[in-house]
C-alpha cells in the first residue's frame, strides 16, 4: 500500500441491524465506489489521503454522509445504520443503476427490473411486460397468457423462480401461459444463459427469478390500490394490497381481479390453413378471459432470524380462438360466438395454481443458513365439445370416466425442499446448497397426449466467489444432479380396428408403456469480473444439462392446436450444453454502454422433427412429428446504450441478435423453432420538472424487427416490421401519498404485423391492433 493511500472497510445495516446488500458506497472527491455484499460489507483500497467524504444514498433510506479523517493506513469504520424513509412505505424503488452495480459482481448476464418498470411497460401478462429487455421475448397465447423466451429458448429450457421456489406449471405446452400475478411482483432478475449450477435441470437456457416483496417497515399499516383498463380487449380490473408490521411480526395480502373480452387485430380476415375466416369487428372470437389471484404472507423477523410463510392461488379462465382449435376448424358457430365479445365458450381452458411455502433464514456465527419448503398444485383443464375421430364412437359413452366436454386434464402436485449455507473464509464467499423435488402428475379427459408420471430431482452444489482485489473477482461452481422419471402405461378407452395378416381385430391400442428412466449429471461453471474504474468486464463458461420431459419421452397423440401427431422417443438422453458468456459495461455521467455476446453448443439438443408419415388412427391423417436429438450451435448477443443529452432528455438503443443452426440430423443446416429475428429499439425519453408533480416522463419507442427467413417447417417466414409505442406517466402528490398514473399506447400506428414467436403465427394471425392502457396506483398509509 502506498504511503499516500489508505484502506477503508465497513458494514452497512438497516435500523434493525439487518444486512443491506447491493448498496453503493461513494468516497469523494474522486467519486470512488464500492458495492456492499450480502453481509452489508464494503471495502476500498488505495484511497487517496485527501479523500474527505463517505456517502451512501439508497431508495427507501435516508441519505448518510460522514467526514473522513484519514490518519491511519487501514481504517475499520463503525457499523453504519441507515434509517428508513417512512414516506417510501413498503415499496423500495430500485433505480436503473441497481442492475449495473449488480453486474459488477456477477459473471453471468443478469437483467434486473422493478415494479416501476412493469407498470410503465404493462402488458397482458408478466412476460409481455418484460419483453422490452433485449434477449427476452415471449410465446404469447392471446392477450392474457405468455411464457418466457430467453435467447430463443423456452418451455422446459427456462425456469421461473418465485419467492425462492421453482414454479412448476405445465410449461411444456406452447398454449400454456405462466401462472404468475404480475401485480404481486416487486423485483425480477432475468439470467440470460445457463443457470443449472444454481437451479438444476430446466435452467439450461436461463431463469426468471421473482424476488420476494420487501418486508414492511416496523410499526406500519398500509397498502396500495391498482386500477387498469385496456382499450383493445376492453379489459378492466385491478389489485388491492394491504400490509402491516409491528416490531417482529408482519403480514402482506393482495387480491387481483381481471376481466377482458376478445382482443382485436388490424385485419378482418385470417387464413386458418388456407381457409378464410372472417372476423366480426376485427375481434378474435372466443379469446376473452377472467383472472382471480389471491396472495398472503406472514412472518417473524429479528436481527438474526427470519421466517416467512407464503400462500397464493392464481385462477385463470380463457378461451381459445374458436376457428383454430380441433380437427374441424370450419364447423364453428360464428353467430353464437359473435353475440358477445366477453363470453367464454368452448373451447376454453381453466387453470388453478396453488402455492404454499416457507423460507427461514438465520445467522450462526459466520454462516447465513436458509431453508425452504414448498408445495404446489397445478390443475389444468381444457374443455371442448366432443368430436369423434378415427375409431372413437360417434356417441360419447354414458359410463365414461371423464365428462363429455373434458378434452384434457393435467393435475400436478409438487413437494420441494432446499437448504443453503452462505459463509466467508478469508477472501472467499462460499455458498453450499442442496435441493430436492418430488412430482406427481395425473391425467384425465377423452383425448390423450402425454401419460401420467412421477418425477424426482435432487442436486448438490458448491459456489465460491473469490475477491482477489478491488479489481478482480473470480467465480467457480460445481453441481451434481440426479433425476428419475416413471411413466405409466395408457390404453385407449375405445377399440380400434387393426388388420394383420389379412385378419381384422378390435384392440384397445396401447399409447404408452410403463417406463422408468434415471439421469445423472455433473456440471461446472467458472467466471471472472474485472472492474478497472468505470469499465466492467466479465466472462463465464460452463456446462448445463436438462432431463428429457414426459412429452419428449412418451407423447403419442394429436396436438389439436398444431394439427399434428406428436410422438416421443423413450431412449432420449439428457440434453447437455456448453456455453461461453462475455460482458462489457461502461458508465459515465451521461453515457452507459453494455454488450453481452454469447456462444452455445449442444451435442444432443432435443427437438420435434416432422416426418413423411401420417397418422391413420386418430382423425384427419395428421402429419407425424417425432422427438429427436442432434448437434446444435447458437450464438448472438445483446447491446444496450443510453445517453443523457440534457438534464431532462435522454435516448437509448436496445438491440439483440441470435443465430441458431442444427449441425446434424435430418434437419441439418436448419435453425431451431421459435428463433426470434434480430431487432433494434430506439427510445427517447423526456422527464420535465412540473410543479406538484414528480417522476414525470414522456417516451416514444420505435422497434424495427428484421425478417425471419431462417425457419424450420412447418414454420413460415416472417416479414420485417416497424412498430411505435408511446408512454407517459407522473406522480401526483396528495399530502404524504403519491397518486401514480401511467398511460401507454401500444402499436401507435395500428400496424398489421406478424410476431414470429407467437403461438398463432402458423395461421398468419397478426398481432393486436392499437391498445391504450391506463394504469393508476394509489399507495396509502393508515398508520405509522
Regions found by a protein language model. Give the residues of each.
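C-terminal beta-signal and adjacent terminal beta-strands/loops
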Residues: 260, 266, 601-604, 608, ...
Amino acid at each position: 500500500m502506498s504511503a499516500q493511500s489508505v484502506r477503508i472497510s465497513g458494514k452497512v445495516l438497516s435500523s434493525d441491524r439487518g444486512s443491506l446488500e447491493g448498496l453503493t458506497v461513494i468516497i469523494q472527491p474522486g467519486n470512488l465506489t464500492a458495492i456492499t455484499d450480502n453481509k452489508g460489507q464494503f471495502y476500498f483500497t488505495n484511497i487517496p489521503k485527501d479523500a474527505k467524504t463517505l456517502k451512501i444514498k439508497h431508495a427507501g433510506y435516508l441519505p448518510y454522509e460522514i467526514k473522513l479523517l484519514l490518519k491511519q493506513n487501514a481504517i475499520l469504520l463503525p457499523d453504519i445504520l441507515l434509517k428508513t424513509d417512512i414516506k417510501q412505505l413498503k415499496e423500495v424503488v430500485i433505480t436503473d443503476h441497481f442492475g449495473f452495480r449488480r453486474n459488477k459482481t456477477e459473471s453471468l448476464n443478469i437483467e434486473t427490473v422493478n415494479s416501476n418498470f412493469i407498470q410503465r411497460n404493462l402488458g397482458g401478462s408478466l412476460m409481455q411486460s418484460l419483453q422490452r429487455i433485449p434477449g427476452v421475448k415471449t410465446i404469447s397465447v392471446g392477450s392474457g397468457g405468455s411464457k418466457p423466451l430467453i435467447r430463443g429458448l423456452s418451455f422446459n429450457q427456462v425456469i421461473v423462480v418465485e419467492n425462492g421456489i421453482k414454479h412448476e406449471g405445465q410449461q411444456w405446452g406452447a398454449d400454456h401461459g405462466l401462472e404468475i400475478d404480475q401485480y404481486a411482483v416487486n423485483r425480477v432478475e432475468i439470467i440470460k444463459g445457463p443457470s443449472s449450477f444454481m437451479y438444476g435441470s430446466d435452467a439450461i437456457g436461463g431463469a426468471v427469478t421473482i424476488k420476494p416483496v420487501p418486508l414492511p417497515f416496523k410499526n406500519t399499516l398500509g397498502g396500495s390500490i391498482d386500477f387498469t383498463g385496456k382499450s383493445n380487449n376492453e379489459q378492466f380490473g385491478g389489485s388491492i394490497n394491504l400490509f402491516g408490521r409491528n416490531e417482529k411480526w408482519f403480514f402482506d395480502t393482495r387480491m387481483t381481479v381481471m376481466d377482458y373480452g376478445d382482443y382485436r387485430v388490424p385485419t378482418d380476415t385470417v387464413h386458418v390453413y388456407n381457409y378464410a375466416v372472417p372476423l366480426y369487428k376485427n375481434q378474435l372470437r372466443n379469446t376473452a378471459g377472467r383472472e382471480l389471484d389471491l396472495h398472503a404472507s406472514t412472518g417473524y423477523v429479528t436481527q438474526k432470524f427470519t421466517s416467512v410463510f407464503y400462500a397464493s392461488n392464481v385462477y385463470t379462465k380463457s378461451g381459445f380462438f374458436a376457428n383454430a382449435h380441433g380437427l374441424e376448424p370450419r364447423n364453428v358457430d360464428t353467430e353464437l360466438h359473435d353475440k358477445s365479445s366477453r363470453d367464454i365458450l368452448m373451447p376454453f381452458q381453466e387453470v388453478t395454481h396453488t402455492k404454499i411455502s416457507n423460507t427461514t433464514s438465520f445467522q450462526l456465527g459466520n454462516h447465513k443458513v436458509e431453508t425452504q419448503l414448498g408445495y404446489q398444485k397445478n390443475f389444468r383443464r381444457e374443455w371442448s365439445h366432443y368430436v369423434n375421430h378415427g375409431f372413437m364412437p360417434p356417441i360419447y359413452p354414458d359410463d365414461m370416466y371423464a365428462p363429455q366436454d373434458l378434452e384434457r386434464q393435467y393435475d400436478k402436485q409438487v413437494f420441494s425442499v432446499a437448504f443453503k449455507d452462505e459463509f466467508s473464509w478469508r477472501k472467499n464467499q462460499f455458498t453450499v446448497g442442496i435441493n430436492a423435488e418430488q412430482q406427481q402428475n395425473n391425467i384425465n379427459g377423452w383425448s390423450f397426449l402425454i401419460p401420467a408420471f412421477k418425477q424426482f430431482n435432487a442436486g448438490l452444489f458448491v459456489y465460491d466467489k473469490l475477491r482477489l482485489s478491488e479489481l478482480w473477482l473470480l467465480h467457480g461452481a460445481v453441481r451434481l444432479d440426479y433425476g428419475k422419471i416413471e411413466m405409466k402405461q395408457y390404453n385407449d378407452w375405445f377399440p380400434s380396428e387393426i388388420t394383420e395378416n389379412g385378419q381384422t381385430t378390435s384392440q384397445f391400442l396401447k399409447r404408452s408403456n410403463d417406463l422408468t428412466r434415471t439421469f445423472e449429471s455433473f456440471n461446472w461453471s467458472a467466471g471472472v469480473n474485472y472492474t478497472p474504474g468505470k469499465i466492467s468486464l466479465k466472462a463465464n463458461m460452463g456446462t448445463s444439462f436438462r432431463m428429457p420431459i414426459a412429452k419428449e419421452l412418451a407423447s403419442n397423440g394429436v396436438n389439436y392446436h398444431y394439427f399434428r401427431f406428436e410422438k416421443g422417443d423413450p431412449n432420449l438422453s439428457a440434453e447437455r450444453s456448453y456455453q461461453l458468456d462475455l460482458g462489457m459495461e461502461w458508465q459515465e455521467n451521461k453515457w452507459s454502454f453494455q454488450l453481452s455476446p454469447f456462444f452455445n453448443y449442444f451435442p444432443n439438443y432435443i427437438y420435434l422433427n416432422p416426418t413423411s408419415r401420417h397418422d391413420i388412427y386418430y382423425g384427419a391423417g395428421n402429419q407425424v412429428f417425432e422427438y429427436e436429438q442432434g448437434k446444435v450451435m447458437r450464438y448472438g448477443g445483446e447491446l444496450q446504450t443510453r445517453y443523457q443529452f440534457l438534464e431532462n432528455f435522454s435516448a437509448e438503443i436496445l438491440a439483440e441478435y441470435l443465430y441458431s443452426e442444427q449441425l446434424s440430423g435430418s434437419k441439418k443446416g436448419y435453425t431451431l423453432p421459435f428463433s426470434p429475428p434480430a431487432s433494434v429499439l430506439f427510445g427517447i425519453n423526456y422527464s420535465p420538472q412540473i410543479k406538484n408533480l414528480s417522476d414525470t416522463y414522456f417516451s416514444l419507442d420505435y422497434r424495427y424487427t428484421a425478417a425471419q427467413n431462417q425457419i424450420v417447417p412447418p414454420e413460415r417466414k416472417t416479414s420485417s416490421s416497424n412498430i411505435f409505442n408511446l408512454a407517459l406517466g407522473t406522480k401526483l402528490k396528495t399530502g404524504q401519498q403519491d397518486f401514480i398514473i401511467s398511460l401507454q399506447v401500444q402499436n401507435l400506428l395500428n400496424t398489421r404485423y406478424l410476431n414470429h414467436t407467437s403461438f398463432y403465427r402458423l395461421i398468419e394471425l397478426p398481432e393486436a391492433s392499437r391498445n391504450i392502457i391506463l394504469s393508476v396506483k394509489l399507495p396509502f398509509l393508515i398508520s405509522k
